[in-house]
Amino acid sequence: MKNIRNFSIIAHIDHGKSTLSDRIIQICGGLSDREMEAQVLDSMDLERERGITIKAQSVTLDYKASDGETYQLNFIDTPGHVDFSYEVSRSLAACEGALLVVDAGQGVEAQTLANCYTAMEMDLEVVPVLNKIDLPAADPERVAEEIEDIVGIDATDAVRCSAKTGVGVQDVLERLVRDIPPPEGDPEGPLQALIIDSWFDNYLGVVSLIRIKNGTLRKGDKVKVMSTGQTYNADRLGIFTPKQVDRTELKCGEVGWLVCAIKDIHGAPVGDTLTLARNPAEKALPGFKKVKPQVYAGLFPVRSDDYEAFRDALGKLSLNDASLFYEPESSSALGFGFRCGFLGLLHMEIIQERLEREYDLDLITTAPTVVYEVETTSREVIYVDSPSKLPAVNNIYELREPIAECHMLLPQAYLGNVITLCVEKRGVQTNMVYHGNQVALTYEIPMAEVVLDFFDRLKSTSRGYASLDYNFKRFQASDMVRVDVLINGERVDALALITHRDNSQNRGRELVEKMKDLIPRQQFDIAIQAAIGTHIIARSTVKQLRKNVLAKCYGGDISRKKKLLQKQKEGKKRMKQIGNVELPQEAFLAILHVGKDNK
């Protein structure tokens, strides 16, 4: 056990994490040169394309160090984006140390910071590495100081390397072996294995990535999942050298994969503990929590006959993604679809893109909403994830909205713009620290505002320099109202939105104006109204198309003209009673952009 090293790499997007892992795999001979390709560990096309890591992966490598010993390195790859922070914390819980990779040109960013603090809270040994030193813009001294200032770890002798050219990667490995402690644990004790990640394989069922904390797991053992109490047979187990290699046992301290013929990914929840059925551990490993979606949106197929295919596609995706939540929803305007819950906006985009790309579906998304906590007058607490589920105004005793704690890192020059943006988003400043010319800002901002377009606007006001990390803090009482859209007096459920009372007038007016441009003119007037309860706050009218009935009259008597106009008016009135308004697709997308253009 003393020769095992479990580590992961913490890095901001694009700081060279995947490239560094490619180099490490190459040096340790995990893959032959022929099989080597860029970003070995990012297995999804989307991961490659966006240059981000979404699912955790692991690799077991043998490294012959300069002291003559051969070490087993277990490298667990972690996602870097804020939406996947729970997956990061699971990956880190399986390690004893982490490499903090920072781009020597760009310096420390907010997400690096968030994950680094998670690692330090778990008492991991953090080893700083300065990457991309071959770039002309690299300034390793300044960045080393930045790491000491902002993160607070000693970086004077940080390893310098360039993953692209391979310079200094050997030093990274030596430092790894020297500084990161070997795993602790009792090889003779009852089995405790942490599930780092699970994914679905068409042939094997659910494959789980596990780290053995105590005891030993052998092929053919009966294992028990501690949170659900179900038992399974350990059919196959082994390690990744990125390729799957079968083994007969996994020893204490090792990281590997396990197949138990579980059909459903919820049977092996990420972060759960596995133990032996015949000799169970007394308690589960700490840190397991059910992942709760933060953002909800309705997804509807454009063609209603795609509904079945859509349902199957969601089912398949959720096999791989335990944090994706969905339930059927029907809307009078959009037909049948699903209400889906996501970890954040990036997660939502990725799921939507995967549905459209891998399953050939055309989808409409309704405006993303967050979960509100509503206390009704009968003192019962319910959680509302869509405007249509909100109880009537007179039944609500108190409505509480989720507040997110946002950590931002940005250059001083953009401080004013960013503070203005945060205040506009109803944010409350809780902390502000200067580090050289960087500022670390902490704000508490309502989740609904963060979800709408906060990230895009933050990037544009700071010219892309600001970085953001947010997490759910608490529910807080707030004066929120539901704005309904009525078209000719009929509510359109898919267009409703929940917003703060102060913004409701503006949001309502913008929405109505936007709809007016999008709804085609008909033979009769169309009234578009925004209402809070029964109180109308904005209205605009799409004018009717009318024929000039007086064209044939020439001179003519006034009473003759009046008669014709009156007749036309009655016809229009009759039309209006029976006419239906067809809403075009763009109308639903309009909601997504309310409040974006005019800023």
Curated annotation (Swiss-Prot):
Residues that bind GTP: D14, H15, G16, K17, S18, T19, N131, K132, I133, D134
Matching PROSITE patterns: G_TR_1, G_TR_2
Top-rank taxon: Bacteria
Record-linked CDD domains: EF4_II, EF4_III, LepA, lepA_C
UniProt KW keywords: Cell inner membrane, Cell membrane, GTP-binding, Hydrolase, Membrane, Nucleotide-binding, Protein biosynthesis
Coiled coil: none
Subcellular location as annotated: Cell inner membrane
Catalytic activity: GTP + H2O = GDP + phosphate + H(+)
Membrane topology reported for the UniProt record: Peripheral membrane protein
GO biological process: one example: positive regulation of translation
Name of the top EC class for this enzyme: hydrolase
Chain ranges passing through the membrane: none
InterPro entries: EF-4, EFG_III/V, EFG_V-like, EFTu-like_2, G_TR_CS, LepA_C_sf, LepA_CTD, LepA_IV
Pfam families: EFG_C (PF00679), GTP_EFTU (PF00009), GTP_EFTU_D2 (PF03144), LepA_C (PF06421)
Gene Ontology cellular component terms for the protein in this record: plasma membrane
Family named by the database record: Belongs to the TRAFAC class translation factor GTPase superfamily. Classic translation factor GTPase family. LepA subfamily.
Known role: Required for accurate and efficient protein synthesis under certain stress conditions. May act as a fidelity factor of the translation reaction, by catalyzing a one-codon backward translocation of tRNAs on improperly translocated ribosomes. Back-translocation proceeds from a post-translocation (POST) complex to a pre-translocation (PRE) complex, thus giving elongation factor G a second chance to translocate the tRNAs correctly. Binds to ribosomes in a GTP-dependent manner.
UniProt name for this protein: Elongation factor 4
